[in-house]
Amino acid sequence: MAKKSKIARNDRRRETVERYAARRAELKEVIRRPGTPEPERNRAVEELRRQPRDASATRVRNRDSVDGRPRGYLRRFGLSRVRMREQAHAGFLPGVTTSSW
């Protein structure tokens, strides 16, 4: 089980990313576009720099939805490998079967 403070911090980061996502995309497009005048590009870079660090999507960590474990995350299930194995053996994941060959 991950610390509750780590899980809460990650949740706050997700909210911050969601809040700033549209404006960040606009600014990045202005910066990326080759025809943008230099002063406008500089203003966009400066505004992007003034945004909070946690507004960047790379700051969000994928965590197990059950206990918040940060490692071994499987996107398809939203679980860590440990929790996925437990739930698969218990039959809680429809369509998941143990392999045999």
From Swiss-Prot:
Residue segments, region Disordered: 32-71
Protein's UniProt name: Small ribosomal subunit protein uS14A
Species name: Streptomyces griseus subsp. griseus (strain JCM 4626 / CBS 651.72 / NBRC 13350 / KCC S-0626 / ISP 5235)
Keyword RNA-binding: yes
Reported function: Binds 16S rRNA, required for the assembly of 30S particles and may also be responsible for determining the conformation of the 16S rRNA at the A site.
Family: Belongs to the universal ribosomal protein uS14 family.
Subunit structure and binding partners: Part of the 30S ribosomal subunit. Contacts proteins S3 and S10.
Keywords: Ribonucleoprotein, Ribosomal protein, RNA-binding, rRNA-binding
rRNA-binding recorded as keyword: yes
Gene coding for it: rpsN
GO annotation, biological process: translation
UniProt-recorded Gene Ontology molecular function terms: rRNA binding; structural constituent of ribosome
Domain of life of the native organism: Bacteria
Cellular component annotations (GO), alphabetically ordered: small ribosomal subunit
Positions in coiled-coil regions: none
InterPro entries, per database record: Ribosomal_uS14 (IPR001209), Ribosomal_uS14_bac/plastid (IPR023036)
